[in-house]
């Protein structure tokens, strides 16, 4: 008895294994570098915005250079764009594990970036108003001070929601994908899946006034997420995806072969 093998993808030309592995390495490297960019670009921002955030009215009505605030704004733009980049670059891989999680990851990154950029616009408006306030007097000066203070508070709230709430959500999506696929050591996504609820809880506590946005509890609860994102960036940059994880993905997505007896 002979057999006839029908393969669903028989007409599809598959890339050579070496070419496929090179493509996966490129994706991992790009995703890892972008993650490291978001991490590095976000570190100086707390210091650069300190003068404005600690004393909004004093900053608006005071004199001096805006250089630190402008650099901080530029780094926030870099952080926002690199954040979107991580989700877009990794999409060809993440969608193979869960299309819903992959789309959710991209969506949450876009929302996060949008919130960050709204904050940047607010900061740049404060810089402009600060220059206008130099020659203002009376009611106009008071109006500029109040508006400037409100814009600083807007920046703080968008920053809280962007780098707190949305960061927790997008790390839940990525943590789930990485844990399920074993593309990186499982301890890395476990840290992310633990850290995401913690930063969501911290963001909620800050919104309801339990503690300040810049405080010991807020910093402590953000550490696991910071460790997760840094570890993802380093691992993907240095090591790439684990071969065993890629092999499992290939096996899961391989076309099903049906063997039927010939008549």
What are these language model-derived features?
Residues 2-263:
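Hydrophobic, aromatic-enriched alpha-helical segments typical of multi-pass transmembrane helices
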